[in-house]
From Swiss-Prot:
Transmembrane segments: none
Spans annotated as Disordered: 1-95, 204-242, 387-417, 561-586
Polar residues bias (residue ranges): 56-68
Cystines in this chain: none
Zinc finger (MYND-type) residue numbers: 497-533
Protein name per its UniProtKB record: Protein CBFA2T2
Keyword Zinc-finger attached: yes
PROSITE patterns: TAFH, ZF_MYND_1, ZF_MYND_2
Biological processes per GO annotation: DNA-templated transcription; negative regulation of DNA-templated transcription; negative regulation of neurogenesis; negative regulation of neuron projection development
Domain of life: Eukaryota
Binding site for Zn(2+) 1: C497, C500, C517, C521
Length: 586
């Protein structure tokens, strides 16, 4: 067959080919030369007809990379990052089978529906932003890269690496279908999409995929998810690839010997070992197509198994290739993470159980305390009732018959209470009444004690105030008496100084009575002495002669004239007391 090597020609069975780069059922084909090669042509239902595309069809800078195993998408490698609508022009001329287009469109619609539902789960505003981004992506107003960046900014969740190649491979199909429907309705694609938005984002026909298969486990700032979302995402392994894993597409020198062993598919049929890929190199495969993500491989293996059962081939190999089965065993790191989460959950449960046990113990103790307190107040109430009854009927205390009757009444009352007809509400009511009565008595006693204490305090304050006033009056009286006594002592003492008590050497010139040791003590004592100075003079005095001394003696009575009194008072107001001059009676 032309264009396909002999060992890898198709058999006569009808097989629907996959479009290049789609994540549906794809087989690995070896190429005879490493240069650019067009994708496989569609199969003619009437028979196989070799069709080859000339190399000029790839002059737009698009090189189709080889398809990967496990149904993973293989996006084209672009030399320029243009919008996604540029791929629709190259695919518009290719006629694809109806089943291929329907399957790819269904996957793409389910993917877009999942994105919108994920945004709605976060918040209605984010859901509206995601819906706007999806419509803009389908209308080719934004590129796939811009859609990826804006979606990550809106939801704070990055998409998985296989999403961008998947969109680049399958978005042109959806855009071509939208263009065809818009032309049939004589509308523009944007108008048709605005009117038939429910067809694109319809969730009733097929269940959308899990958002954890499309989004990373950690958000942009590295925070953990909420617990409810974490439970949904924990059913799969972390996003980090295992350390030791056979690459899905590897060059010939790195072909693992483990692939030479026959593998068993889900229908227990053995398949021959596929030959190594001799014409591929790591430079031909973009980094986003390696798909080392464990979650992606599990989802791809599930799709491969479903397609294998639906195809009904049951081990019939058309091209001698088989799809590699994915190892579902967890790595040591994944097991450690799972055990750590399990241990944390068990610790949380144990803490909750311990807290519940402590709370129950506290409640039990509180109930016991309340029961004891209730019994105590019941006893107090019964005692108060007995005392009240005893005070109301004092005559019964003197007669034994009345005492016996009272005891029998109390016993009868207690028996009626403990009988089957005793109501619990009545017990609580009486207990509350007893408690209230005791509280009222206690409050009255407290108020009485407070009033008595206040009265005593007022009496003590009044008595202390009276005692203090009496003490002040007594102190003033004693001070006055002491002053008079000092003055009297000074008057009686003629040889001692009236100020300091030492031996006196001078006499006051005003009264000729006060004695001082010097002028300093006379000045110091003048404030007290000037009130009585001159008042103790004798009423009769002998007339003074000119030859007589200016200072009269204390034994000679002198009768001072008014002029002498004025001069003595003027002399007493001066700084230094002076001698009194004799004035004639003339």
């Amino acid at each position: 067959m032309v264009g396909i090597p002999g060992p890898y020609q198709f058999t006569g069975d009808k097989r629907v080919p996959a479009m290049p780069g789609s994540p549906m059922e794809v087989k690995i084909h070896s190429r005879s030369s490493p240069p650019i090669m067009a994708p496989l042509p569609p199969v003619n239902p009437g028979g196989l007809r070799p069709v080859g595309f000339p190399p000029s069809s790839h002059s737009n800078g698009i090189n189709h990379s080889p398809p990967t195993l496990n149904g993973a998408p293989s996006p084209p490698q672009r030399s320029s990052n243009g919008p996604s609508s540029s791929s629709s022009s190259s695919l518009a001329n290719q006629q694809l089978p109806a089943t291929c287009g329907v399957r790819q469109l269904s996957k793409l619609k389910r993917f877009l529906t999942t994105l919108q539902q994920f945004g709605n789960d976060i918040s209605p505003e984010i859901g509206e932003k995601v819906r706007t981004l999806v419509l803009a992506l389908v209308n080719s107003t934004v590129t796939i890269e811009e859609f990826h960046c804006k979606l990550q900014e809106a939801t704070n969740f990055p998409l998985r690496p296989f999403v961008i190649p998947f969109l680049k491979a399958n978005l042109p199909l959806l855009q071509r279908e939208l263009l065809h429907c818009a032309r049939a309705g004589k509308q523009t694609p944007s108008q048709y999409l605005a009117q038939h938005e429910h067809i694109l984002l319809n969730t009733s026909t097929s269940s959308p995929a899990d958002s954890s298969e499309l989004l990373m486990e950690m958000n942009g700032n590295g925070k953990r998810h909420s617990p409810d979302r974490r439970e949904e995402e924990r059913e799969t392994a972390p996003a980090e690839p295992p350390v030791k894993r056979v690459c899905t597409i590897s060059p010939a020198p790195r072909h693992s010997p483990a692939l030479s062993l026959p593998l068993v598919n889900s229908t227990s049929h053995f398949h021959p070992t596929p030959p190594p890929l001799q014409h591929y190199s790591l430079e031909d495969i973009p980094s986003s197509q390696l798909y080392r993500d464990h979650l992606n491989k599990i989802g791809e293996h599930r799709d491969v198994r479903d397609r294998h059962h639906s195809s009904g081939v049951n081990g019939n190999l058309n091209n001698g290739y088989q799809e590699e089965l994915v190892d579902h065993r967890l790595t040591e790191r994944e097991w450690a993470e799972e055990w750590k989460h399990l241990d944390h959950a068990l610790n949380c449960i144990m803490e909750m159980v311990e807290k519940t046990r402590r709370s129950m113990a506290v409640l039990r103790r509180c109930q016991e305390v309340d029961r004891d307190e209730l019994n105590y107040w019941k006893r107090r109430f019964n005692e108060s009732n007995e005392i009240r009854k005893g005070s109301e009927h004092p005559s019964r205390q003197h007669s034994p018959s009345s005492t016996d009757s009272g005891a029998s009444d109390s016993v009868r009352d207690f028996g009626s209470r403990t009988g089957a007809g005793y109501v619990t509400d009545e017990i609580w009511r009486k207990a509350e009444e007893a408690v209230n009565e005791v509280k009222r008595q206690a409050m009255s006693e407290v108020q009485k004690a407070v009033s008595e204490a206040e009265q005593k305090a007022f009496e003590m304050i009044a008595s202390e105030r009276a005692r203090m006033e009496q003490t002040i009056v007594d102190a003033k009286r004693r001070a006055a008496e002491d002053a008079v006594l000092v003055v009297n002592e000074q008057e009686e003492s003629t040889e001692s100084c009236w100020n300091c008590g030492r031996k006196a050497s001078e006499t006051c010139s005003g009264c000729n009575i006060a004695r001082y040791c010097g002028s300093f003590c006379q000045h110091k004592d003048w404030e007290k002495h000037h009130r009585i100075c001159g008042q103790s003079m004798h009423t009769q005095a002998k007339p003074l002669t000119p030859s007589r001394s200016l200072i009269p003696k204390a034994s000679d009575p002198v009768l001072l004239s008014p002029t002498l009194e004025r001069s003595s008072s003027a002399t007493s107001r001066s700084s230094t007391p002076a001698s009194v001059t004799a004035v004639d009676g003339l």
